Amino acid sequence: MARTAKRYKKNTEKKIPGIPVCMAAIYVRLSVDSDEKKSESIETQVTLIKEFIQKHNENPDKEYEIAVYDIYSDLGKTGTNFDRPGFERMMNDVRAGKINCILVKDFSRFGRNYIETDNYLEKILPFMKVRFISVCDNYDSFAPDAKNQELSMNLSLIHI
């Protein structure tokens, strides 16, 4: 009787695919302006994003699951530049391969400088294979219609 190599058996076994897990960073930011609304508070942003994650994970038709790696926050920091301790710590974790998904309440919490924000969303994060989700803007960078959603990003970043 001929021997069958194990490698051939592995190729014929039917594999049951698991649901991929996105290791996510929750990023929240609040500048200290007198006109900041209560709806923008750090706690409110975190709660909103966690509710989104819970609802997403409960969906039986989901293509991936979201697991929170850490919460990164910048209190009292402007969104017009990216020189923020919480943001830099998050990006260090992205570079270390600990995170492959970033969730924010809306684009303006990520950054208000259109050019730099666009650079992150269009070049840096895609190059690093990092999914970006803006909850209130209904934006997911891995969605098929992500390119069509850029207009809402452009409008929400206008700082008057």
Language model features with spans:
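Short, structured surface patches at the beginning of a domain
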Residues: M1-I158
